[in-house]
Amino acid sequence: MKKNNSIKIIFSLFLLLIIGITGTTLIAQDIDTTKIKNKEFNENVVFYPQHQDDEILWGVSAITKAIEERGADNVYIVLVSDGSGVNVFTRNPIFTKIPRKEKEKLRNNEFKAALQELGVKDKNIIILADEDNKLGTHYELMEKTILKFEQELGSVTHIAHHYKYDDHIMHRKNGEVLKRLRDEHKIKDARYFMKPKYVKDIPEEKREYYKSETEEERDKAKKAINQYKTIDVNKGKLGIGYTSAHSYFDNLYKDPNYTSVLSVYWRIRRLKIFNRLWFYL
């Protein structure tokens, strides 16, 4: 009996080793591309940035392309968090006595100004903190909003943060909401913002690159980015976005095409042969 158990353990370890060695091959052979239209958005496009500035840092050119392809009436931006917990507010003493709602307003001033430069319509900007009437982040309402868009509009491309390849826990939770709904087949087209340093972790055939290539596109992108750097006290703009994430903004400024990279939805599935082998262990 002990001998049989030892054999099973050895065989299990061997099987795991084989799976690890062939992992890359399995990924390449088992990518679900049937419902993905590469670099083509569905009739309606909804972006779900977690914080004010995420839509620009990771999606400025993607938003421009979405509007060009589907029209401004069919492109929506859904802000998931109120953004009032950004490090600028906690580290700079001038903000200590400002109410949280006022901090949110300061961030939204930059957010709305940036989207206006890109041509996003005011009626298509949805701030979940306003709808939920509570502070913080709003993952449950995000899920309801995703499902509402899917059910009411039918042909929708949903874009959130990546559920794994992101160094911000709130971004990953944001992406997990979208991934779960796609895993459960409740939505058809899910894609994810990619920070530049994680692009290498995504298979090449699952990456989408969006660039601002014309003078008009580049002008729009730069003006949108500048809204997070501009200081204009009279308009309630204090350059909060740039101050809190200046290195990310500087990298984007250095890119002449203001490139946005998205990852399309994909899953790794175990091959049937491994399921059968596992059954006999």
What role is predicted for each listed range?
Residues M1, R100, S260-S263:
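Helix-centric, low-specificity signal for extended rod-like, repetitive segments
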Residues M1-L15:
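N-terminal Sec-pathway targeting helices
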Residues F11-F14, F41, F47, Y76, ...:
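Phenylalanine-focused residue identity feature
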Residues L15-T22:
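Hydrophobic core
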Residues T22-T25, G241-T243:
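Compositionally biased, intrinsically disordered low-complexity regions
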Residues G23-E184:
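Active-site beta-strand->loop->alpha-helix modules in alpha/beta enzyme cores, enriched
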Residues E110-L118, D122, K186-L281:
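The feature marks non-catalytic terminal segments
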